[in-house]
Swiss-Prot record:
Keyword ATP-binding found: yes
Catalytic reaction list: (6S)-5,6,7,8-tetrahydrofolate + formate + ATP = (6R)-10-formyltetrahydrofolate + ADP + phosphate
Alphabetic keyword roster: ATP-binding, Ligase, Nucleotide-binding, One-carbon metabolism
Lineage: superkingdom: Bacteria
Positions with a binding annotation for ATP: 65-72
Gene Ontology molecular function, alphabetical: ATP binding; formate-tetrahydrofolate ligase activity
HAMAP family given in the database record: FTHFS
UniProt-listed InterPro entries: Formate_THF_ligase, Formate_THF_ligase_CS, P-loop_NTPase
Pathway noted in the entry: One-carbon metabolism; tetrahydrofolate interconversion
Record protein name field: Formate--tetrahydrofolate ligase
Enzyme class name: ligase
Similarity comment text for this entry: Belongs to the formate--tetrahydrofolate ligase family.
BP GO annotations: tetrahydrofolate interconversion
Length: 551
């Protein structure tokens, strides 16, 4: 089979104005970035806000292998299939981060014959949204250090600066650094560090903001440091929320692109699901709901991460109703959770596959607690044997369909689309976590009901931070748990369906502007590192300007 980039290059793209017409976006609201990409002017909301909402389909997955299980490919395929069946459907996705593109996971524009295009642009610099987030984030850092150098009127304690710098790259060497070296002209020396842009609070804010006014308000409330007299320093104290909003004025507008079958797609925003809330912008999804019958959206990593955060935090924040959830599974991931080593996953092993189905069962059981219909999509790979596929179908008690979107595009997801249409209903969804719960109750509920832990413990550092949050009145905010994506638990080595273990909260981080608290479990880091042989070694460009190796 041809590579993703070869398939993408052969696709016949339609002008973005034509794609916009298909979902009733008139030309006055289309801001083209070349022939095939456009921003959509936020003024369109006044025109469509009274339209009836379409139905929202959330795509998630079982606990993945390191390479991922094809959620994006399945999401795109499902939306294309719904369009093939005469339904008006839009897929809404996150923007790829350059870190994973050049790291182990590769791009995030789908794969095979189920892609959003133009994939080279989407996977690389796209419309500059992520760079705008980086610029806004680093402006805060620059202003903090300049403020300290020129008199420090706010009394910022350099040892209590919470705001690290950012870059959209996997670079472990930048996790902990010292800035301000080289003499007083370069500022005051202090410890600092970098996080990846997808983990920036500004990325979360961009994806949660409802409009420019809300964006500016959220930016102003970011807590960046503490003063010598223990007061919290916010962006509004630095008087730069206006400048930050200016840097983000175009980034807040949704990006319209197309699938390989010329159906519409919004690709906007890119917070990670293991260290943030893990789904595309509220603005893009709300707009898509007003413009189509069915919106297919994806939440990062497995159902214990992206889907939980979508159902407990994003949907209540945005006011979404969720009408169905699709859980992507693969024979490879099932075998992996059944104990098969990574280099043996292509070998037939029905026994291990059946054992690994416990992981899928737990995720489905968890999702049903939200009172939503759950459908399983088995993303079929060429290495899957007929016996494995037959045994999966025989033993999967949940409505399920085999998906061949990678090989066949929308045609390969028609069975899934029909199954979704059969099971979808008017939303009766309700979150598991409520605002009335205390912070500890929220964490304990997630730990026991979703992560299947027996109990929760807090390190001394976490207990101290909890007191800090209470003192400043932030303990009532929603909680986002940052943990490994490789296990339902807080330990990446605990595969399949661990239960009854101790779940440890080691620290808390405040995202006051975004409007949530991050509870850190395990050794999760906000700045990834590259692997020994990163995807970067496979990427090249020929003399004619054709990119090679991007996927």
């Amino acid at each position: 089979m041809k590579t993703d980039i070869e398939i993408a290059r052969e696709a016949k793209l339609e002008k973005i104005t034509k794609i916009a017409e298909k979902i009733d976006i008139s030309e006055e609201y289309v801001e083209p970035y070349g022939k095939y990409i456009a921003k959509v002017d936020l003024k369109i909301w006044e025109k469509v806000k009274n339209n009836k909402d379409g139905k929202l389909i959330l795509v998630t997955a079982m606990t993945p292998t390191p390479a991922g299980e094809g959620k994006t490919t399945t999401s795109i395929g499902l939306s294309m299939a719904l369009n093939r069946l005469g339904k008006k459907s839009i897929v809404t996705l996150r923007e790829p981060s350059l870190g994973p593109v050049f790291g182990i996971k590769g791009g995030a524009a789908g794969g095979g014959y189920s892609q959003v295009l133009p994939m080279e642009n989407i996977n690389l610099h796209f419309t500059g949204d992520i760079h705008a987030v980086s610029a806004a984030h680093n402006l805060i850092s620059a202003v903090i250090d300049a403020h300290i150098k020129f008199g420090n009127e706010l009394g910022i304690d350099p040892t209590r600066i919470y705001w690290k710098r950012t870059i959209d790259m996997n670079d472990r060497a930048l996790r902990n650094i010292v800035v301000g070296l080289g003499g007083s002209a370069n500022g005051q020396p202090r410890e600092d560090g970098f996080i990846i842009t997808a983990a920036s609070e500004i990325m979360a804010i961009l994806c949660l903001a409802k409009d420019l006014k809300d964006l500016k308000e959220r930016l102003s409330n970011i807590v960046v440091a503490q003063s010598y007299d223990k007061k919290l320093i916010k962006v509004k104290d630095l008087k730069i929320e206006g400048a930050l909003a200016v840097l983000l004025k175009d980034a807040i507008k949704p990006n319209l692109v197309q699938t390989i079958e010329n159906t519409p797609a919004f690709v906007h925003g890119g917070p990670f699901a293991n260290i943030a809330h893990g789904t595309n912008s509220i603005i893009a999804t709300k707009l898509a709901l007003k413009l189509s019958d069915y919106v297919v959206t994806e939440a990062g990593f497995a159902a214990d991460l992206g889907a939980e955060k979508f159902l407990d935090f994003v949907s209540p924040t945005a006011g979404y109703d969720v009408n169905a959830v699709v859980v992507v599974a693969t024979i490879k991931a099932l075998k992996y959770h059944g104990g098969v080593k990574k280099d043996e996953l292509d070998n037939e092993n029905v026994e291990a596959m059946l054992k690994g189905m416990e992981n899928l069962r737990v995720h489905v059981e968890n999702l049903k607690k939200y009172n939503v219909p759950v459908i399983v999509a088995l993303n079929v790979f060429g290495s899957d044997t007929q016996r494995e596929l037959d045994e999966f179908s025989k033993n999967c008690e949940i409505p399920h369909a085999l998906v061949y979107a990678f090989e066949k595009g929308g045609e390969g997801a028609v069975d899934l689309a029909n199954l979704v249409l059969e099971n979808i209903k008017e939303s009766q969804y309700k979150p598991l976590i409520t605002s009335e719960m205390s912070l500890e109750e929220k964490i304990e509920t997630l730990a026991k009901e979703i992560y299947r832990a027996g109990n929760v413990i807090y390190t001394d550092k976490a207990k101290s931070k909890l007191k800090f949050l209470r003192k400043h009145g932030y303990d009532t905010l929603p909680v986002i748990v940052a943990k490994t994506q490789s296990s339902i638990s807080d330990d990446p080595k605990k595969i399949n369906a661990p239960s009854g273990y101790t779940f440890t909260i080691r620290d808390f981080e405040l995202s006051a502007g975004a409007g949530f608290i991050v509870a850190l479990a395990g050794d999760i880091m906000r700045m990834p590192g590259l692997s020994k042989i990163p995807n970067a070694v496979n990427i090249d460009i020929d003399e004619e300007g054709n990119i090679i190796g991007l996927s």
